[in-house]
Amino acid sequence: MASTATNKITLTSSDGVEVTIERQVAERSILIKNMLEDLGDSGEPIPIPNVNESVLKKVIEWCEHHKGDPPSTGDDDVDSRRKTTDIDEWDQKFMQVDQEMLFEIILAANYLDIKALLDVGCKTVANMIKGKSPEEIRKTFNIQNDFTPEEEDQIRRENEWAEE
């Protein structure tokens, strides 16, 4: 429920749990911000059908910490984001979760359109992969190798440039 006095809104997770938060925190999500603009101050809880309670609370924790950050403009320096996998200390600690939760946070950030959180999640995964062999990456993410030795050799030959 939205209240002009406290400026709070309620979100309903996929498992039916209602979470009340500040509107400013919720608006870190472009999806929620657009829904609020479209629906107005109806006072009705906003359903978040693709995100369960535990993930929603984790995303809200991140949004609360970053509520004072300037909003993403969409035309931020894309090149600088692509070139670095540096993550600030608070975000590194925040992302110290099990793999399932990490991937759920990434999916939720994508669904809720929280670009900065999506970037942090993807950089976390990139850092998990950095410097590892394909075998080590498979072990880290529990991925089964379904290539034949011949297919692996062909892929290595085609991608030799990446090994340099």
UniProtKB/Swiss-Prot annotation:
**Which CDD domains does the record match to this protein?**
BTB_POZ_SKP1
Q: Does the keyword Transport apply?
A: no
Gene Ontology biological process terms in this record: protein ubiquitination; ubiquitin-dependent protein catabolic process
Query: So what family is this one in?
Result: Belongs to the SKP1 family.
Q: Any idea what job this protein has?
A: Essential component of the SCF (SKP1-CUL1-F-box protein) E3 ubiquitin ligase complexes, which mediate the ubiquitination and subsequent proteasomal degradation of target proteins. Controls sulfur metabolite repression, probably by mediating the inactivation or degradation of the metR transcription factor.
Q: How does it assemble?
A: Component of the SCF (SKP1-CUL1-F-box protein) E3 ubiquitin ligase complexes.
Keywords on this record? Answer: Ubl conjugation pathway
Give the matching SUPFAM superfamilies: POZ domain, Skp1 dimerisation domain-like
Q: Where is this region: Interaction with the F-box domain of F-box proteins?
A: 106-164
InterPro entries to which the protein is assigned, alphabetical: SKP1, SKP1-like, SKP1-like_dim_sf, SKP1/BTB/POZ_sf, Skp1_comp_dimer, Skp1_comp_POZ
SMART domains documented for this protein: Skp1
The annotated pathway is: Protein modification; protein ubiquitination
The protein here is known as E3 ubiquitin ligase complex SCF subunit sconC
Record keyword Transferase present:
no
